[in-house]
C-alpha cells in the first residue's frame, strides 16, 4: 500500500474531526454541515478499502498536522493562503430538497465511474428539471455533492451521487453521468431540462431549451436511440 495514500487518509480523518468540532459548537453553516456528512461516508468507505481504523488514523493524522504547523511560519502560511484559489459552494437545491428521502416504483441503478446513478423507470411523460449542489473553482464545477431530478410537482425521480468508497471525480465524470441520467429519463418520453447554474459551471454555456451541449458521441447515441424507438412504435402499430 502506498504510504502517501495512508498518510492522506490519516490527515483527512483528523481534519474531519476538527470540522466536526466546529459543527458541535454551532459555528458551521448548512453547506459546511452537508460536506461534513458526505465526507464522513467517504472516509468510512476509504477506511474499509484500505483496512484502516478511523479512530487510530485520526490520532496519527493529528500528529502529522501538528508537526507541519510547528515547522510552518506565519509568513509562509499567509503566502500559501493568498496563492490558493478558494472554491465556492453552489446550491440549486434547498436543504429540504437535498435531504429529502425518496423511493422508486421501478428502480434502476447504474455505476458510471466514481458516481452512482439512480432512476425511477416508472416515470413517464413528465417535465423534469435537473438541479445540483456542488463546489466551483475557476468558474468550473469542482466536486458534485448531489444531483437530483425533479418533476414539476416536486417529486424526486432520479439522482446522481458520488460513491463513498470511490473518492474523487472529474467534471467529465459528472457530465457523462448526467448524459446517462438524461438518456434513462428520456427513454420514457420525459422532457428533461438542466438548471442554468449547472449548465454554466459544467459546460461553460447554457442552452435555451435547458439541455446541456452534447458531444458528437452523445448525439450519435441519441440518434440511435431515436431510430430504435421509431422501429418499436411501428411494430406496435
Swiss-Prot record:
GO biological process, one term: symbiont-mediated suppression of host mRNA processing
Keyword annotations from UniProtKB, A to Z: Eukaryotic host gene expression shutoff by virus, Host cytoplasm, Host gene expression shutoff by virus, Host mRNA suppression by virus, Host nucleus, Host-virus interaction, Inhibition of host innate immune response by virus, Inhibition of host interferon signaling pathway by virus, Inhibition of host PKR by virus, Inhibition of host pre-mRNA processing by virus, Inhibition of host RIG-I by virus, Inhibition of host RLR pathway by virus, Interferon antiviral system evasion, RNA-binding, Ubl conjugation, Viral immunoevasion
Annotated stretches, region: RNA-binding and homodimerization: 1-73
Region called Disordered, residue ranges: 205-237
InterPro entries registered for this protein in UniProt: NS1 (IPR004208), NS1A (IPR000256), NS1A_effect_dom-like_sf (IPR038064), uS15_NS1_RNA-bd_sf (IPR009068)
Molecular function GO terms recorded: protein serine/threonine kinase inhibitor activity; RNA binding
Superkingdom, natural source: Viruses
Annotated segments matching region PABPN1-binding: 223-230
Gene Ontology CC, one term: host cell nucleus
Record carries keyword Phosphoprotein: no
Biased composition (Basic residues): 217-237
Segments carrying motif Nuclear export signal: 137-146
Region (CPSF4-binding): 180-215
Residue ranges of the motif Nuclear localization signal: 34-38
Compartmental location: Host nucleus; Host cytoplasm
Modification note: Upon interferon induction, ISGylated via host HERC5; this results in the impairment of NS1 interaction with RNA targets due to its inability to form homodimers and to interact with host EIF2AK2/PKR.
UniProt cross-references to HAMAP family, sorted A to Z: INFV_NS1
Self-association state and partner proteins as the record states: Homodimer. Interacts with host TRIM25 (via coiled coil); this interaction specifically inhibits TRIM25 multimerization and TRIM25-mediated RIGI CARD ubiquitination. Interacts with human EIF2AK2/PKR, CPSF4, IVNS1ABP and PABPN1.
Function per UniProt: Inhibits post-transcriptional processing of cellular pre-mRNA, by binding and inhibiting two cellular proteins that are required for the 3'-end processing of cellular pre-mRNAs: the 30 kDa cleavage and polyadenylation specificity factor/CPSF4 and the poly(A)-binding protein 2/PABPN1. In turn, unprocessed 3' end pre-mRNAs accumulate in the host nucleus and are no longer exported to the cytoplasm. Cellular protein synthesis is thereby shut off very early after virus infection.
Record note on domains: The dsRNA-binding region is required for suppression of RNA silencing.
Family (UniProt): Belongs to the influenza A viruses NS1 family.
UniProt-recorded name of the protein: Non-structural protein 1
